[in-house]
Amino acid sequence: MAKKPTEKQLYKLKNEWLGQFFEEVKPKEFYRAVFPEGSFERKGHFEDGKANGIITIVENDKAKNRIVFDDLSVIDEVKGAEFAVMSPVAYSGRNRTAANARWLYGIAIDLDGVEMPQLRDVFHQMNHDIIPKCTYCINSGHGLHLYYLLEKPVPLYKHLQDKLREFKYELIAKVWNRYTSTFTEREQVQYQGIFQGFRMVGTQSKLGKRYPVKAFETGERVTIEYLNGYLMDKSKAVTDFHYKSDLSLAEARKKYPEWYEKRIVQGERRERWHVKRDLYDWWLRKIKEGASVGHRYSCLCVLASYAVKCDIPEDE
């Protein structure tokens, strides 16, 4: 009976197997794929008005964040760090919080308990359309990080964040199964949200500095619609969203000159829906006819809303 490889031997075996079929990419190449040129604000160019990546580094039990600008120069600076994590998300501000999250560039799944049979089965299932094919496979040491990079980023509006979290949980339940992980009990599955940061490519894995996190390009970019097709619970599919526009501000100026003049040059706010004052007068009559006790406040709120839509003067 063959002796079971140690974790460090297994790390090397996984790299060798992945290297037979896929191209290994350097850290900066990987993060340029995650965040294409133009995704982030340029250093010193606040006028860009864009979000940025954030790296969290833990040293001596203290965590600090570093901003990633569009040149990605900081990626080289953190290479070899003992513990540095980053998520495929662009943030405004300096903290990786849900409130600061602006754009989702991909879905990253942490698959633990991956030995050689499980590694081979992951790609067997991908090749036979059982689970979605990932864009990059990361050897994180003990397991794999599967990155599904989106063709276009998705805006992280507050109402979408919970939907995307449930969507990702359902995707994890599909990918993490009894053939892809040695952790076969459902309670052993690790469910992480969309903001979860993962050990960065080029930094140390849990096995130490001689065992860096490595990335292999394994597939194409994907869409949310493509991933929806693999969900076991179709009610978790994300459909009410839109992708980031390809138009730059300069291109929008040429294509929509009137919009550019009003919104950008003159700084006008987006137009509201305007209604004739008949609606306001009708609701005011309804209130005078008898707003019931306990509902007066709600009636006045609706009246105020109609007043705005009907352009009723404040003094009235």
What is each of the regions a protein language model found here?
Residues 110-118:
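Short, surface-exposed ligand-recognition loops at beta-strand->loop->(often short) alpha-helix junctions
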Residues 91-99, 123-141, 184-190:
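Catalytic micro-motifs at enzyme active sites that drive phosphoryl/nucleotidyl and oxygen chemistry
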Residues 109, 132-163, 190-206:
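Histidine-centered divalent-metal-coordination microenvironment in nucleic-acid enzymes
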Residues 76-81, 141, 145, 195, ...:
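Short, well-structured alpha-helical interface segments that form or flank functional binding sites
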Residues 62, 93, 179-265:
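Catalytic "initiation/cleavage/transfer" segments centered on a nucleophilic residue
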Residues 1-106:
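DNA replication initiation on ssDNA origins
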Residues 117-128, 150-181, 208-226:
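Helical (often loop-to-helix) elements that flank the catalytic cores of nucleotide-handling enzymes
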Residues 152-154, 234-316:
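Modules that initiate DNA replication and primer synthesis
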